[in-house]
Design a protein with these regions (language model features):
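Short, charged low-complexity linear motifs
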Residues: 19-20, 31-32, 108-117, 141
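A short, polar/proline- and glycine-enriched secondary-structure boundary/capping micro-motif
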Residues: 45, 91-95, 120-127
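Hydrophobic ligand-binding cavity/cleft-lining segments
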Residues: 2-52
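A conserved amphipathic terminal alpha-helix motif
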Residues: 116-142
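Hydrophobic-ligand binding "helix-grip"
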Residues: 53, 61-110, 114-118
Length: 142
């Protein structure tokens, strides 16, 4: 009983993040979508104001602030996966992933976002991703 109470207190103190996903239909080729997810110029068109890359470390710039993430894996025309450096330094296993999904029956495409947020921030995080994905759709005309 005491151990359970201690675990609950630890979870409250660390505010563990919960995984969530969003699937967003986008009418575009896999190549165009992948380019928008994986290159500095592509990301700067919809995700951030600018991005600087040094090896696998991406520095994303938004309205004068910056966040740094490491590209941990990618597969051409399928997905890119990043970990925020701050989360990495804190020993957290959180990441965010941008994945291209193609429905084999209809050929329709979607971008699937996987991300993590604190429970009380999930809705805000989803709304932010949806706004970003609407920017992507506008940029590529899909």
């Amino acid at each position: 009983m005491l151990l359970q109470l201690v675990k609950k207190v630890e979870n409250i103190e660390t505010m563990e993040k919960e995984k969530f996903q969003i699937e967003f239909p986008i009418n575009s080729s896999k190549g165009v979508l992948y380019n928008c997810m994986s290159t500095p110029s592509g990301l700067a068109e919809w995700f951030c104001d600018d991005v600087n890359i040094k090896k696998d470390v991406h520095t994303f710039l938004w309205d004068g602030s910056e966040e740094v993430a490491r590209l941990v894996s990618k597969k051409k025309d399928e997905f890119v996966k990043f970990k925020w450096i701050e989360d990495e330094e804190n020993g957290e296993s959180n990441y965010f992933e941008l994945r291209i999904k193609v429905d084999e029956m209809t050929g329709e495409r979607a971008v699937i976002i996987t991300d993590f947020a604190e429970e009380d921030e999930i809705q805000d995080a989803k709304e932010l991703w949806i706004a970003q994905l609407e920017n992507l759709r506008r940029v590529i005309g899909g």
